[in-house]
Amino acid sequence: MKKNNLKKIAKNVIDLEIQALKKLKNSINNSFNKTVSLISNCQSKVIFCGVGKSFIIASKISSTLSSVGSPSFAISASQCTHGDLGSITKKDLLILISNSGETEELKPVIQYAKRNKIILVGIVSKKNSVLYKSSDVKLYIPESKESGHGIVPTSSTTSQLALGDALAIASMNYKNFGKLDFKKFHPSGNLATKLKTVGDLMISGNKLPFVTENSNM
């Protein structure tokens, strides 16, 4: 394969994902507002669940939410039927992510949520799917063409991640979560360094060492 073809492939992949994001942007409706409200007012945990690539996306969204003031974690639907359903309580908000909405591993999780009256938000691209029909709040991601012969999760996972980022940032604004709040949950790394103030580094009071001209070396 010629190197120029590789560049063409890269640009095509990015173009497909840009198109998917434009579709997603135009699809944002009141279900988004409802989900932000549920996340921001949740008195327990926001739990994300998915399978395969969707679980990886779920983990990233969950991590972002936790860092901006909404306690969250992600669990793999594959593990739920082996005891992890016990992690989900009635006070939690459950958000399931699936492109098809028909993933077999998700069905017991949906049944558990319904049986225990746990609020269920579905992030899904198929309106005729079990997940879409079962969700209390439906976050629809328009179907888009995937790269790699149209079968590799690319455009769909990019859209899922973008929607998750939008939920997290909107929740930040909803809760008036500012830079100082963010610093409390992120005390290390380059981001924390940028947010440090003089007061964080300054030594004052009894901790400030003083010597006189007569002090011994």
Regions found by a protein language model. Give the residues of each.
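An N-terminal, well-structured beta->alpha segment
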Residues: 2-44
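Short, basic/glycine-rich phosphate-binding loops at helix/coil junctions
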Residues: 11-16, 61, 65, 194-203
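Short, glycine-rich nucleotide/cofactor-binding loops
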Residues: 20-21, 25-28, 96-102, 211-214
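Bateman/CBS regulatory modules and CBS-like beta-alpha motifs in cytosolic regions of diverse proteins
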Residues: 193-217
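Short, compositionally biased "basic patch" segments
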Residues: 1-13, 51-59, 193
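A short, charged, Gly/Pro-tolerant segment at domain boundaries
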Residues: 178-192
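Glycine-rich phosphate-binding loops that contact phosphosugars or nucleotide phosphates
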Residues: 44-175
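Alpha-helical scaffold segments in soluble metabolic enzymes
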Residues: 16, 23, 34, 38-41, ...
